[in-house]
């Protein structure tokens, strides 16, 4: 995305220390179900159709081997922020993205 590209160019352009920089939208930490619900709601108003699945249920109903999932997987933006780059709020960026996407889908 544009935000990720800007973050990468910022880190490279400022000669930031070598290392791993988490790069994701800022704002409230949400579950994957919350994010999917926000996408569906913003895209076509049916976010209520997204049904969360607990990790226990996911593992219980999986067919075949399943990769382990972390209990808490929020990314830490502090290293990116320490070199002077602040990621925009993911919910605002989602709204902006869908504004640009909808006309393309209607054609």
Which residues are covered by each model-predicted region?
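Non-catalytic, hydrophobic alpha-helical segments
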Residues: 4, 23, 35, 80, ...
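Amphipathic alpha-helical segment in the mid-to-C-terminal domain
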Residues: 1, 32, 86-90
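C-terminal amphipathic/interface module of NAD(P)-dependent oxidoreductases
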Residues: 68-107
